[in-house]
């Protein structure tokens, strides 16, 4: 159907209007291409899209014409009319629309509904606005390829995306945000700032970290390790592959296989790239007999995992096939669970606050349709997570059915500078994997005592977090994370020696500094350093040598003169405190 709807879920006026905009666009496209075959056209978070099978490839130049025709349909004030009919009648109606016929075959009911407006008749549950004139603020944005029903073996259709809002002011605000988003796109900045690269010779979704990106990642990882060691975690490392039988025991082979890569044969045994680190940590825990007095035990790893993603959904650093999770697993007694989850929440808040994310949304994701284990343990685990959130006075929403197959979880999504949500920390309580691997400790009575397990990340993955961080700051990272923190610019050759002397003093404090001795003009050097988003440019000439000062220009364009010793002290303080301000 044009938009399959869960009838139990209330539908907002905005969602209804966006869905109607998709139908109006479909009629506009049909008026341009009468032979068009229609796919689906749902409302989405910020607007709508519709998929078409067309006689030619669309170009961006087609969008204004489609939009003009849409505006004509809106002004015509055409009514939306709902009709019900039998599936046989609908098959006759859509005889020349093969995609609609396929959708019809999947509908279990014998009576279906269609919506008509103007010259369009579409298979749809609705609801819709009463008249086309109710769709007042929309803009067509882009064209993309989309496989029919997301299946790469099916035809490739052309998808037109549009934005739609209840009023023109909201639309204008959104379009401004899109314009700013394009400037901050981590794929664009990643290339301009030489942060990372992707190569088809290597394969889609497999990332090369270039020197500038590698130093940012290194700084994040060192900070992560230091904070975990302070909080009682032990750092571990695990292999990238394991025998298939290990994943069968864990349940991943049965519940998660579609996200795993095909097995490889090694000496007659099947191995597979790991999709997760948890099972390795379990085996480490079981490496010897343990007493209940040793708990909790916290293992942390920056572990690279591999998960299958269709080529069509790969996106820079944010959707990849190989990525490094900031992973940790806590083994504890049942009565220690709530306290441990509270500690993880404290750590997660500290980490994301440090990186400058101050707004976030918290979801409590509950038992999915496919799950393992007993219902009472699921309820207990869910209750533990809820209590931990409430004891921290953290507001949250319940996200039904979005837990993982072995346990419920807390998902924290933080907002960037443009108000966009990014996946951040996750915290999962798990009783199932410890049972599957027979994990226990020697209790106070000398008998085996079961152990609970907490899976958690505080950043998510290094790749996705780097994409978010890049877009949050538009590539202008906080000073402590900037690949190059200072560029010294001598006005003339005779000033180079002084510039090199200052650079040496800064390097002794582990400041990342360079001297630009190229035969370019000073203004060109400053401009290039600004484009590279280096926080500080220090210009030195005769006056600066005489006064032992520096003329400071920041990447934002502000200027001042300061004694070098004062600047060095200020810079070191900003780095040590991880300030997000220049």
Swiss-Prot record:
Cofactor-binding details, from the entry: Binds 1 zinc ion per subunit.
GO biological process: threonyl-tRNA aminoacylation
Region called Catalytic, residue ranges: 185-478
Matching Pfam families: HGTP_anticodon, tRNA-synt_2b, tRNA_SAD
Catalytic activity: tRNA(Thr) + L-threonine + ATP = L-threonyl-tRNA(Thr) + AMP + diphosphate + H(+)
The EC number(s) this enzyme carries: 6.1.1.3
GO cellular component: cytoplasm
Required co-factors: Zn(2+)
Xref: InterPro entries: aa-tRNA-synt_IIb, aa-tRNA-synth_II, aa-tRNA-synth_II/BPL/LPL, Anticodon-bd, Anticodon-bd_dom_sf, Thr-tRNA-ligase_IIa, Thr/Ala-tRNA-synth_IIc_edit, ThrRS_anticodon
Keyword tRNA-binding: yes
Keywords: Aminoacyl-tRNA synthetase, ATP-binding, Cytoplasm, Ligase, Metal-binding, Nucleotide-binding, Protein biosynthesis, RNA-binding, tRNA-binding, Zinc
Binding annotation for Zn(2+): 278, 329, 455
MF terms (GO), sorted A to Z: ATP binding; metal ion binding; threonine-tRNA ligase activity; tRNA binding
EC main group: ligase
Chief location of this protein within or outside the cell: cytoplasm
Assembly notes: Homodimer.
Record NCBIfam families: thrS
Functional note: Catalyzes the attachment of threonine to tRNA(Thr) in a two-step reaction: L-threonine is first activated by ATP to form Thr-AMP and then transferred to the acceptor end of tRNA(Thr). Also edits incorrectly charged L-seryl-tRNA(Thr).
Family membership: Belongs to the class-II aminoacyl-tRNA synthetase family.
Protein name, UniProt field: Threonine--tRNA ligase
Organism expressing this protein natively: Dehalococcoides mccartyi (strain ATCC BAA-2266 / KCTC 15142 / 195)
């Amino acid at each position: 159907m044009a938009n399959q709807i869960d009838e139990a879920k209330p539908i907002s006026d905005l969602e209804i209007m966006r869905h109607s905009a998709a139908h109006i666009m479909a009629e506009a496209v049909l008026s341009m291409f009468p032979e068009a075959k229609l796919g689906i056209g749902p409302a989405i978070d910020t607007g709508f899209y519709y998929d078409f099978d067309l006689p030619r490839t669309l170009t961006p130049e087609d969008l204004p014409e489609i939009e003009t025709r849409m505006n004509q349909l809106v002004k015509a004030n055409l009514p939306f009319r709902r009709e019900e009919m039998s599936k046989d009648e609908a098959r006759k109606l859509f005889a020349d629309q093969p995609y609609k016929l396929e959708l019809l075959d999947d509908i279990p009911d014998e009576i279906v509904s269609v919506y008509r407006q103007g010259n369009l008749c579409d298979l749809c549950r609705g609801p819709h606005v009463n008249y086309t004139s109710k769709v007042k603020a929309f803009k067509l944005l882009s064209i993309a390829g989309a496989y029919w029903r997301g299946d790469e073996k099916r035809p490739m259709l052309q998808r037109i995306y549009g934005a739609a809002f209840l009023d023109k002011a909201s639309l204008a605000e959104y379009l401004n945000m899109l314009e700013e988003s394009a400037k901050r796109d981590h794929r664009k900045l990643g290339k301009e700032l030489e942060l990372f690269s992707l190569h088809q010779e290597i394969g889609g979704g497999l990332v090369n970290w270039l020197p500038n990106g590698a130093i940012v990642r290194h700084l994040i990882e060192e900070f992560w390790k230091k904070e975990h060691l302070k909080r009682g975690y032990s750092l571990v490392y695990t292999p990238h592959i394991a025998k298939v039988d290990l994943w069968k025991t864990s349940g991943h082979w049965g519940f998660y296989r579609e996200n795993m890569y095909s097995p490889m044969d090694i000496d007659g045994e099947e191995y597979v790239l790991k999709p997760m680190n948890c099972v390795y940590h379990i085996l480490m825990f079981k490496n010897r007999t343990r007493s209940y007095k040793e708990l909790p035990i916290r293992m942390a790893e920056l572990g690279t995992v591999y998960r299958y993603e269709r080529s069509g959904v790969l996106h820079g650093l944010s959707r990849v096939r190989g990525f490094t999770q900031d992973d940790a697993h806590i083994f504890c007694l049942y009565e220690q669970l709530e306290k441990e989850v509270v500690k993880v929440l404290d750590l997660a808040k500290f980490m994301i606050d440090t990186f400058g994310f101050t707004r976030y949304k918290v979801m409590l994701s509950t038992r999915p349709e496919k799950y393992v284990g007993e219902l009472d343990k699921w309820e207990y685990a869910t209750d533990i997570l809820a209590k931990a959130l409430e004891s921290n006075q953290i507001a949250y929403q319940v996200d039904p059915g979005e837990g993982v197959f072995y346990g419920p979880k807390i998902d924290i999504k933080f907002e960037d500078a443009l108000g966009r949500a990014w996946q951040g920390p996750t915290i999962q309580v798990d009783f199932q994997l410890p049972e599957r691997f027979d994990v226990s400790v020697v209790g106070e009575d000398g008998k085996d005592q079961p152990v609970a397990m907490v899976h958690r990340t505080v950043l998510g993955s290094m790749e996705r977090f780097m994409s978010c961080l890049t877009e949050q700051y538009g590539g202008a990272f906080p000073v402590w994370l900037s690949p190059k923190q200072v560029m010294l610019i001598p006005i003339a050759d005779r000033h180079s020696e002084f510039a090199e002397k200052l650079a040496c003093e800064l390097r002794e404090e582990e400041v990342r500094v360079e001297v630009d001795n190229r035969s370019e003009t000073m203004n060109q050097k400053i401009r290039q350093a600004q484009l590279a988003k280096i926080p500080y440019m220090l210009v030195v000439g005769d006056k600066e040598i005489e006064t032992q000062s520096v003329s400071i220009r920041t990447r934002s364009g502000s200027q001042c003169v300061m004694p070098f010793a004062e600047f060095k002290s200020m810079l070191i303080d900003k780095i040590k405190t991880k300030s997000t301000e220049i």
